[in-house]
Amino acid sequence: MKPTLLLLAAGMGSRYGGLKQLDGLGPNGETIMDYSIYDAIQAGFGKIVFVIRKDFEDQFREKILSKYEGHIPAELCFQALDDLPEGFSVPEGREKPWGTNHAVLMAKDIIKEPFCVINCDDFYNRDCFMVIGKFLSELPEGSKNRYAMVGFRVGNTLSENGTVARGICSKDADENLTTCVERTEIMRIDGKVSYKDEQGEWVAVGDNTPVSMNVSSWWLFPPISPPQRRPSPRSTASGSKPGPTTETSGPPGR
C-alpha cells in the first residue's frame, strides 16, 4: 500500500499578502508544493490530498490540481471554521483557520491509508520524503496508531530575512519524541541560534537542535483516531504520546 501525501494549504497568507500557495517561483511557474509533490512521488507516495478553503477552490483546481490529472490520484478537502466536533464552537471574531489537527481531521473521509502531513509553503528536500516513506513502508503489517516526525537541524532552517517559527524538540535515548514546543521567533544572534522565550529573553540553542517543520507521518487505526477529533492549539504543543523521530539535515528556512 503506497502512502498518501496530505498537504495543508488552507492558510490565509496574511503576512505574505496573498495566497502564496498558488504563486509560482520555479522556471516554469512551479509552486513550492510542486517540488514537494515531485519529491514525494519519487519516494514512492501514491496519492496526494490537499486541505484548502472553499473560497479559492476554482483557482486551486485551475492552477494546481489540473496539472496532476493523469499522473497521480489527487483530491481536495475543505477546512472551514465551523466544521468542528460536537461540543465545540467558533469564538466570536475568529477568522484565522484552526491548526494542524483540525486540518488533518478534514481529510478523515478521504484518507484510509498511511499518510504524511506537510505544509504547502515550506520547501523540504527529497531526503525528507525518502526518510518518512521508508518509515511507513517498514511498519509491520497490521500496525495501529503509529507516528513519526522528521526532525531538522535548526541551524539549517533559518532565514536571512528575519525570524522563523519552529517547534523546538527533545527526544529520549530511544529516539522517541518527548516534547515539541513552538517558538515563533528564532534567529541567529552573535553567531548563535536563539529563540525568544515567554519572558522576552533570548535563549541560545545548538545548531543541531532538532526542530519540527510540520513533517509527520501517521498510520492511524481507525484512520482518524478519537484523540485527533479536537482543534489543536497553535501556540504550544507537547507530545502526549511519544513517537519516533527521524532526522535530516534540513533545507533552507522560509
Which stretches of residues belong to each language-model region?
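Conserved N-terminal catalytic core of the sugar/cofactor nucleotidyltransferase
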Residues: 1-13, 27-117, 124-125, 129, ...
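Conserved catalytic-core motifs of eukaryotic protein kinase domains, centered on the activation segment
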Residues: 18-19
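Short helix-terminating capping/connector loops at secondary-structure junctions
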Residues: 69-72, 141-145, 244
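Active-site flanking residues adjacent to catalytic metal/cofactor-binding acidic residues
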Residues: 118-121, 152
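Conserved core of the sugar-phosphate nucleotidyltransferase
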Residues: 126-216
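Conserved beta strand-loop-helix elements of the APE1-like EEP
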Residues: 214-224
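A C-terminal functional module that forms or caps the active site or interfaces directly
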Residues: 229-254
